[in-house]
Swiss-Prot record:
Cofactor note: Binds 1 FAD per subunit.
Keywords on record: FAD, Flavoprotein, NADP, Oxidoreductase
UniProt similarity note: Belongs to the ferredoxin--NADP reductase type 2 family.
Pfam families: Pyr_redox_2
Obligatory cofactor(s): FAD
One example GO MF annotation: ferredoxin-NADP+ reductase activity
Designated name of the protein: Ferredoxin--NADP reductase
Reaction(s) catalysed (UniProt annotation): 2 reduced [2Fe-2S]-[ferredoxin] + NADP(+) + H(+) = 2 oxidized [2Fe-2S]-[ferredoxin] + NADPH
EC number: 1.18.1.2
Subunit structure: Homodimer.
Lineage, uppermost ranks: Bacteria, Bacillati, Bacillota, Bacilli, Lactobacillales
PANTHER family in alphabetical order: THIOREDOXIN REDUCTASE 1-RELATED-RELATED
Regions annotated as coiled coil: none
Enzyme class of the recorded protein, top EC level: oxidoreductase
Amino acid sequence: MNKTIYDITIVGGGPVGLFAAFYAGLRGVSVKIIESLSELGGQPAILYPEKKIYDIPGYPVITGRELIDKHIEQLERFKDSIEICLKEEVLSFEKVDDVFTIQTDKDQHLSRAIVFACGNGAFAPRLLGLENEENYADNNLFYNVTKLEQFAGKHVVICGGGDSAVDWANELDKIAASVAIVHRRDAFRAHEHSVDILKASGVRILTPYVPIGLNGDSQRVSSLVVQKVKGDEVIELPLDNLIVSFGFSTSNKNLRYWNLDYKRSSINVSSLFETTQEGVYAIGDAANYPGKVELIATGYGEAPVAINQAINYIYPDRDNRVVHSTSLIK
């Protein structure tokens, strides 16, 4: 357990959680971010990094990756007072003597207040379901692609048939030594235009095939074994990198154990984003209230309200008047 007690712990490192962390830093309190994925950014970074977003205030258009990069750049100002914990899923929390002990699947964390900004729940990639898969994850087996350049000159195999799988195959065909795509059906689910580009490219297309085995050492996969659907043909595909693009699932399965009032996968909150537990708040898609509009922009407005309420709760005797950033940053 890290025995440092942080003022505010933000559960979720998507755009709303990142802005909440920045605003908390602006208010001069210590902050910890707990994110279930291996990187910050939430849905924009994982599900649509290259897609264009048109409803972010101040940006006529911005991609998901660009948006998250801006948030991370914004956080740099307070890097000394913000700790980031990746690849940790919150399981439970308990309050004793005005301090919360937050239990994750890896550690325990101490905090005076909690702000849930975890969207519809922790992200988890859909797996191949093959033996030793966990040994290769984040080494040379990937479930999403954030930097295409890392595959330059490599032999890459992609599993999947949706937009992401096909788009990655088309882009990697330009820079990789070779690309193969494996899909369990004859027809791809991706956009027709993207599929047409794929079929005209140098990408090796294997349909309908399913993965049945992984070969490699204790850390890196060296080949993928696939089998023809409704057939006996088996092919071994040597590779440098394997990309599994079966999508992601979200789950707030632990929500039911947190003694919070909730509806489906979101937490019911007051107009001040308070939950039914004192010192616990929820914002973004994690929060539910009448008239809720699930937009990133909405979450940006909710974050300062929740952070200010948390500060008032932690430091009731302090002068907590809100000051504009122009007065705080010189």
